Every structure is written in C-alpha cells, then in structure tokens.
C-alpha cells in the first residue's frame, strides 16, 4: 500500500468570527479535530494610544484610557490618575476616594456580566446574555447620570473626580444592589449546574500555579490557579484597605473555575458598593470630591464668576495644563481583567515623556497556544471566552 503523506490542516479563526471577541485572528493548526498550534494575530485595532498620549497634556490624555478596555472604562482611568497623583504627591479627599471605588466596582460588575454571559453564549447558551445585559443597562445609566456618558466617561480626574454625585444617584445605586443579587442568583441557577455548560468547561484550559506565574497571569487567571493575589488586598490603593470583602480562588484552574470566580467576584463587588453607598450617605455625606489645589483641579464655575484668580487658573489648566516634577512611576490597579498598570515617565513638562500601558489581556492572549494545545477545536472558543479578551487594551 502506498504511503500517504498526512499533513496538518490550517484554519483561520476570525477576524469576523462571532466568538472571536472583536478583531482577533487566530491561525489554528489542526490534526483532525485536535489543536496542535495556535498563532494569535494581533494589531488589527492598533491606534497608537501610547504615542498619542505623549502629544497631549495630562488632562487631555485621560479620555484615551476609556478606549482601551471599553467594557469597564473607569478602571483604566483609575490607574492613570493614580500615577499622576503619585508624581504630584497629592491626596484625594475621602469622599472622592469612595466615589472612585464605587465606580470601579460598578465597572467590575459590567465586565464580569459581559464575560460570563458571552462565555455561556460561546458554548451555545442564548438566554444568559439577555439576562445579563438587562443589569448592565441599569449600571450604564448610573455611569450616564454621574458624568453624562454611557461608555467613555472621562470621570476620574487627577486629584479626584470630575463632579460630585447627587444624593438621589447614590440612593439609587444602593437600591440597585439587592435586586441585582437576586437576578445574579437566577443566572447562577440557570448556568452553573447546566450539564452542557459543565461538559464544555470543566477540565478545559488547565494551568498550573508555576505556569501562571511564569506567563505573568493576573486577575481571575492567577486566582483561578489557586493564588489569592488581588491588588486591592495585596497592594491596597484608595480606601480598599477599609473595605470588607473576600477573594475567591479556584481549585482546578480550568475554565469552569474562572467562571465561578467571576460570579463570586460580582457578589463581592456588590458588597463593596454597599459599603461605599452607606458611607457616602452617612459619614462622608459632605466634603470635597477633589483636591483643593487649584494648580491641578479646575475651580468651580461659581468661583470663576466672581474671582479673577479662579478664571486664570481655569484658563491655564485647560490650555497649558499642569507641569509634573521629573521622575518615573508605575501604578497598577486590579482591573476586572487583571493587573492594569501605567508606567509614566515625566520630564518636568506639561506632557508625559513616555506612557507605557500594561494590559492584562495581552499576557493572557499570549498563552492561548499553551492553553489550547492538545484540546479539541470546539474547546478553543471556551478557552478564549474564559480568558476574557477585549481588543482595545490588547492592541492599544
């Protein structure tokens, strides 16, 4: 019998694939149905964000951060303003810190709702996204009421936040929490015990602790491997050290564990939100939301109508911006997808000399080859769904 040359089969996954999460293109090398190699092609959404930020003042560079992980925009802004505040050595008033923490946790819920429901959709369940997006819509309205924009907020500013929250909004956020937890339990009851969902996710995409550290995993990916590493606890920033919450960790480090962690993190985020709301309506009901340093934070409109100095400060801030002392800082926050870091180099002018953005999804996507090798073709979508990729931050 003649010898037959059996060669592997190459297939393109994306960039228009419904499960490709944006503009991802993966070249898969298959041996029958088994994945031998995965080659992610990135760069289809590259906009040169880091270079653009070097041509803008610090205040003008803020909105670029919203356009990275556009599922939870305020979490990215948080890292950038913390880096500027570290350079300038300024303190944010407690009420401003609480508002930031509140909206960071809203962002975490926005992200995890999208991820767990689309992860279920990737493996064939169509109901969860409809349920999840109903709650996301309510949270988007809170974004809109705080700053006027549903998505690209530009709400966190160096020194604090853009404007104070009306009391009615804080009350409405407090009233949102309990109904949200009820709907989360319904979603949990629908998806978690589902036989098909379990078969598609249990023991898929397993990663050991050593491998997770070596591949610079962070966020849910490292906690799924059983490491209680969360920057809100291990390197607390803002007022997270005053908040009570738990860090869920995984046992088997597979796709199912990562799903369960995200579900539990939403409950913990709701717990933090409740604490913020109680303090914003109680002990911290009044007080400034931004630093009172007029060289960094613009004055109120009412001041500008009666004070020449306020008008000058306002004009200088929005034309020239503020100057930072020369130096370099790295600040990381626990974004919903993992450790989002901003490395900022200042040369003493009103623009950053260099901005490096450390996106968690970038490191996770690099591990696609390692995670998927030896699995079936259908498992590639389950793994991709569980590592939570958004291309805005991967390509920057």
Curated annotation (Swiss-Prot):
HAMAP family: NDH1_NuoD. Transmembrane segments: none annotated. It comes from Bartonella tribocorum (strain CIP 105476 / IBS 506). Gene3D superfamilies: Cytochrome-c3 Hydrogenase, chain B. One of its GO terms (cellular component) is plasma membrane. Pfam families: Complex1_49kDa. The gene is nuoD. This is NADH-quinone oxidoreductase subunit D. Belongs to the complex I 49 kDa subunit family.
């Amino acid at each position: 019998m003649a010898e037959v040359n059996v060669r592997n089969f190459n297939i393109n996954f994306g960039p228009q694939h419904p499960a490709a999460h944006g503009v991802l293109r993966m070249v898969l090398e298959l041996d029958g149905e088994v994945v031998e190699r995965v080659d992610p092609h990135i760069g289809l959404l590259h906009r040169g964000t880091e270079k653009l930020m070097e041509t803008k003042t610090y205040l003008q560079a803020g909105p670029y951060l919203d356009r990275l992980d556009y599922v939870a925009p305020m979490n990215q802004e948080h890292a950038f303003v913390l880096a500027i505040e570290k350079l300038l050595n300024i303190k944010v008033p407690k009420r401003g810190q609480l508002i930031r923490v509140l909206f960071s946790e809203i962002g975490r819920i926005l992200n995890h709702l999208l991820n767990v429901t689309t992860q279920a959709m990737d493996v064939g369940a169509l109901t969860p996204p409809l349920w999840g997006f109903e709650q996301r819509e309510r949270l988007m309205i809170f974004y809109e009421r705080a700053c006027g924009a549903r998505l690209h907020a530009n709400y966190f500013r160096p020194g604090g936040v853009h404007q104070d929250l009306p009391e009615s909004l804080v009350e409405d956020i407090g009233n949102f929490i309990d109904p949200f937890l009820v709907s989360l339990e319904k979603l949990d009851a629908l998806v978690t015990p589902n036989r098909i969902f379990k078969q598609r996710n249990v023991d898929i995409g397993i990663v050991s602790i050593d491998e997770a550290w070596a591949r610079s995993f962070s966020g849910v990916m490292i906690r799924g491997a059983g490491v209680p590493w969360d920057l809100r606890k291990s390197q607390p920033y803002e007022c997270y050290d005053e908040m009570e919450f738990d860090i869920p960790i995984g046992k088997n480090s597979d796709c199912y564990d990562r799903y369960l962690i995200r579900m539990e993190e939403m409950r913990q985020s709701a717990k933090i939100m409740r604490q913020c709301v109680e303090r914003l309506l109680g002990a911290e009901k009044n007080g400034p939301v931004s630093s009172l340093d007029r060289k960094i934070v613009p004055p109120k409109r009412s001041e500008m109508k009666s004070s020449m100095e306020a008008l000058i400060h306002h004009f200088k801030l929005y034309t020239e911006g503020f100057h930072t002392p020369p130096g370099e800082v790295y600040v990381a926050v626990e974004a919903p997808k993992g450790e989002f870091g901003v490395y900022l180099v200042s040369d003493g002018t009103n623009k950053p000399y260099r901005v490096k953005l450390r996106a968690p999804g970038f490191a996770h996507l690099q591990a696609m080859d390692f995670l998927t090798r030896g699995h079936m073709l259908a498992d590639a979508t389950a793994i991709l769904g569980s590592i939570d990729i958004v291309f805005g931050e991967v390509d920057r």
